[in-house]
Structure formats: structure tokens, C-alpha cells
């Protein structure tokens, strides 16, 4: 007797469901078996299958930071509930003083064959879990590390972990990232039975520097690296972060106020922004801004809308950045035009905490070091001699580029970190890294974006798809569409243009739509 068609379909559906359940069970068993996996200098502490939507996102400052849309590697306003994955956590002890935590997340279903390494931020000490989840949602196996210390503890706050712990400083500088990558690749091969076909790194700020260090020290680790706002060279970058407070603190008699800095910022915006940029609140191309503080010098009595001669001189020094008094060398560029208001917190001579920690704990191993005695020749050069070999990245990345790997650099023009330094580094990179660098490195300067995210500009773009398309298909990015997200909604799109080009309105169409802009050569 012939069975009804509906019965046959039901039987097929039940059979497929049984097969799927069996496959899921095998995947979970394979995950659990990773707990017994032997890794050099490592102990696997967790190997568990996580069901869809069942992962409780840990709360730490980096978790909250990574939840901003501009920090999402896939350029999404938010990440959703987790897909099913195998969570592996391990502790690495390559030295007697090391205590590196790593996590590797392996999709139970739909792995795309690739690895995504996720960078940290500031002084590290925790993992960027939302960034890991964003990669997981795209089918990537993802990996992260706490860089070798726990920022939730008193001794792990800021740079204090480095005090008396040279091995932990090495872990922070490069060892944690490299070993995380090595072990992630081993776990991928053990779990899926084959190696990852590609490996990408995405990070900003410290995460951007971590990416550059990986490219320099371990050129085989990653096939594509997205390095946002890398503070390189780190010592000179942090010296520049101390410069405004040091300078303003020594010249309190000049009476530079937050209100005056805000006034200068508005004047620079008015002088150098395009009509659209003026309305949206940022300068498209500060590099070609010809505003000078002398234009605001008081003609007579000082008012709220002008600068005294002393204030003009201070502004000139803040723009220039710190210089070595012996050689006349600019140590690091100062504030970019239009960002003067970012200096308001330093008018009373305050130190930038992250930068202060670098000199106190990492370089000089002295918690009582008095930063106001900083010598812009001897102090900076001594710190460079101590930390440069660990944390500075030179301009020769030929071994990375010669194997076909790609590097995407970006920084926001509304960042406290002046984008001019990254332009200078990019140019030296093209000069010193051989012919392959011309086709394998790109720089994007993002108008109106703050430090890695935020600001009035469009700060959200799909970094992951961009680097993947470049590596897999050889499509070098020249124009990337970015979004401004407010309350979970896209309110504006703009093209990001590969330097030296900038986006210009074509004269017609919606000014809030990327389609109304073309990438053109920058002009003054």
C-alpha cells in the first residue's frame, strides 16, 4: 500500500532532524574532548559547548567599550544572541611569572574555515567579548587574550602590572598575542580536522599596535591585519599625551581655559570645514586646514572671543607637539586642527593617566616618578631605549607583505591621536617595505571619528568583510562605505577614501548619503 505523501515527508523530516541532532552531539563531544588536549606551556581550563543564546556576556570595561557600533569588526550596530559554539579557555605560562588567559570560540555549525584574532584596548587586562561574538556570528573561529594580566584587580589596573614584572611586560607587548594565535590554530585543527584557511587580526588603539607588532615579529601569523589608531611609536605617542598637561601646567599665568579652547576649535571648524562638514560638526581634511591661532589674537583688551599673545604662542606649541630641545626634532605631532576642545581636561596641568603609567611603571619602574620633571630629550630617549625594542614597530614589514598579507590602517581625524603621525608612518612603510607594500597596504583617515569610535563622523564600517575581500579576491579597498549609528539606527553614510584621497560632495543628491560623494585628490 502506498504511503501518503505527507507521511513520507514527515519521515524524511524526522530522519534529517535525527541526523542533525547526531551531528550536533558529535560536535559537542569533540568540543569536550579538547579539555584533554596538550598545548605547550598551557592548561585548558574550559572546553564546553554553548547552546544558541545561552552565553552570559561577561561584564568588564572592555566589554562595554566593544559594544559600541564603531568598535564592531563587522560594522554592525549591535551583536545578537550567540550562535552555538565550542568555548575553549586556557591559561598560558611561558615564563614562571606569566599568567596569560586566552579564549578560542569555535562555531559548532557553519564555520567559514577562517580565524579572527581580536585585539585589546588601553592597558588590556580583559577580553573584547562582543568583538569575538561579532566574528562568531560571521562564521569565524575567534580568539582573544587578556594580554597576561587582570585589570579588575588592584595590581592589574592600568600599567601597574608591569612594576617588577618584566616577563608580564613581555607578555603584554607581544607574547600573549602570538601564543594565543598559535594555540588557536592548533585548537582549530584539532576540532575541525583541518587548519584554518585564513587568519585575520582586527584591533584598535592597543589592538592596532598589537596588529603591527604581529606583522613585524610574526609575519606568518596573519594573512590580513586591520590596525586602527595604532599608538606607534608607543613611547613618543605617550609623551605627546603628556605634552598638553605639562605645557599648560607650566604656563598657568597665560590663563588658557576650556572656554578658550572651545572657541579656538569652533574658529578652526568655521575656517576649514566644508559647508556640509560645518553643519555636521567636523573638518573633512585637517591636514590641509590653513587656520592659524594668530587670526584670533586680540587687537586690544582680551575678550572671550580672542586670544592673548601668550595664548597664541601656547596654541602654536600645542599644534606642533613636543620637541626635543637638543635636536629640534618633533617627537610626535600635536593636536589636529579642529580638536582643540579635546585639550580642555588639561588646562590645570593634569597628566593623561594611560601615558603617565607607561613612564612610571613600564619604563622607569617607579610609582613615585614625578612627571612634571620630564626632560623632553633625556627622559623620552631613556624610555625609548627601555621599551622601544619591545613595543615600537619600524617601517620595514617586507616579510609580511612579501607573503601576500594585507594591512589596513585607519584613524579618526577627531582623535586625540593626531592622524598626521599615521600618514608619516604609512609613507615610510611604503618606502621601506619593498615593492609588495604598494599593493598590500592602505590607509584611511576618517573625518569626524574619535578614538576608534564615536564623534560626529561615520565611525561604523565592515572591517572584517573589507580585509577578507582584499585577501581572498585581491580587491584592494579604495572606497569603504561607513555609517553613523544613533540609537541603533543608521542616520548617515559617507565613503571613506584611501589616503591621499578624500570624500567630496558631488553637488547633488542627499548630503547624508554616501552615493552623493566621490573620492578625489585632496587639495588645500
Segments predicted by a language model, with ranges:
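Cap/lid segment of the alpha/beta-hydrolase catalytic domain
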Residues: 74, 112, 121-193, 239-240, ...
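A catalytic-pocket lid/entrance helix-loop region that shapes and gates access to the active site
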Residues: 169, 213-215, 220-323, 445, ...
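Glycine-rich nucleophile elbow surrounding the catalytic serine of serine-hydrolase chemistry
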Residues: 126, 203-213
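Bacterial N-terminal signal peptides that target proteins for export
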Residues: 2-13, 229
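Bacterial N-terminal signal peptides
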Residues: 13-22
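Alpha/beta-hydrolase fold nucleophile elbow
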Residues: 194-205
Amino acid at each position: 500500500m502506498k504511503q501518503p505523501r505527507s507521511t513520507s515527508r514527515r519521515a524524511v523530516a524526522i530522519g534529517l532532524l535525527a541526523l542533525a541532532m547526531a551531528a550536533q552531539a558529535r560536535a559537542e563531544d569533540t568540543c569536550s574532548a579538547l579539555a584533554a588536549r596538550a598545548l605547550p606551556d598551557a592548561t585548558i581550563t574550559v572546553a564546553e559547548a554553548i547552546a544558541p543564546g545561552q552565553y552570559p556576556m561577561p561584564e568588564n570595561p572592555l566589554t562595554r567599550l566593544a559594544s559600541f557600533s564603531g568598535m564592531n569588526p563587522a560594522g554592525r550596530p549591535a551583536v545578537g544572541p550567540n550562535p552555538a559554539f565550542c568555548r575553549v579557555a586556557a591559561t598560558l605560562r611561558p615564563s614562571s611569572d606569566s599568567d596569560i588567559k586566552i579564549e578560542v570560540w569555535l562555531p559548532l555549525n557553519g564555520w567559514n574555515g577562517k580565524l579572527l584574532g581580536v585585539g585589546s584596548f588601553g592597558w588590556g587586562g580583559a577580553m573584547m567579548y562582543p568583538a569575538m561574538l561579532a566574528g562568531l556570528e560571521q562564521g569565524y573561529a575567534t580568539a582573544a587574550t587578556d594580554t597576561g594580566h587582570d585589570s579588575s584587580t588592584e595590581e592589574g589596573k592600568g600599567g601597574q602590572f608591569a612594576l617588577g614584572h618584566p616577563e608580564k611586560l613581555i607578555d603584554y607587548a607581544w607574547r600573549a598575542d602570538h601564543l594565543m594565535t598559535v594555540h588557536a590554530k592548533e585548537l582549530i585543527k584539532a576540532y575541525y580536522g583541518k587548519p584554518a584557511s585564513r587568519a585575520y587580526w582586527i584591533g584598535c588603539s592597543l589592538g592596532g599596535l598589537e596588529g603591527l607588532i604581529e606583522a613585524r615579529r610574526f609575519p606568518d601569523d596573519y594573512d590580513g591585519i586591520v590596525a586602527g589608531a595604532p599608538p606607534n611609536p608607543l613611547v613618543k605617542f605617550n609623551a605627546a599625551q603628556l605634552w598638553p598637561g605639562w605645557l599648560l601646567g607650566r604656563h598657568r599665568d597665560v590663563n588658557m581655559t576650556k572656554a578658550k579652547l572651545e572657541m579656538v576649535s569652533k574658529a578652526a571648524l568655521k575656517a576649514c570645514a566644508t559647508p556640509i562638514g560645518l553643519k555636521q560638526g567636523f573638518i573633512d581634511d585637517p591636514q590641509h586646514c590653513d587656520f592659524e591661532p594668530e587670526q584670533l589674537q586680540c587687537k586690544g583688551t582680551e575678550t572671550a572671543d580672542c586670544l592673548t599673545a601668550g595664548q597664541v604662542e601656547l596654541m602654536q606649541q600645542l599644534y606642533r607637539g613636543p620637541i626635543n630641545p637638543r635636536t629640534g626634532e618633533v617627537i610626535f605631532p600635536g593636536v589636529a586642527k579642529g580638536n582643540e576642545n579635546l585639550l580642555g581636561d588639561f588646562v590645570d596641568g593634569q597628566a593623561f593617566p594611560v601615558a603617565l603609567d607607561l613612564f612610571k611603571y613600564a619604563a622607569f619602574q617607579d610609582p613615585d616618578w614625578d612627571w612634571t620633571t620630564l626632560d623632553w630629550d633625556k627622559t623620552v630617549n631613556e624610555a625609548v631605549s627601555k621599551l622601544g625594542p619591545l613595543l615600537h614597530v619600524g617601517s620595514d614589514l617586507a616579510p609580511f607583505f612579501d607573503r601576500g598579507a594585507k594591512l589596513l590602517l585607519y584613524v579618526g581625524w577627531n582623535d586625540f591621536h593626531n592622524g598626521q603621525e599615521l600618514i608619516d608612518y604609512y609613507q615610510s612603510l611604503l618606502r621601506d617595505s619593498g615593492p609588495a607594500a604598494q599593493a598590500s597596504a592602505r590607509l584611511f583617515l576618517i573625518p569626524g571619528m574619535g578614538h576608534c569610535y564615536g564623534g560626529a563622523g561615520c565611525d561604523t564600517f565592515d572591517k572584517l568583510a573589507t580585509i577578507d575581500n582584499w585577501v581572498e579576491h585581491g580587491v584592494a579597498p579604495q572606497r569603504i562605505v561607513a555609517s553613523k549609528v544613533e540609537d541603533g539606527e543608521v542616520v548617515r553614510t559617507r565613503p571613506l577614501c584611501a589616503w591621499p584621497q578624500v570624500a567630496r560632495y558631488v553637488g547633488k543628491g542627499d548630503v547624508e548619503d554616501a552615493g552623493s560623494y566621490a573620492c578625489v585628490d585632496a587639495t588645500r
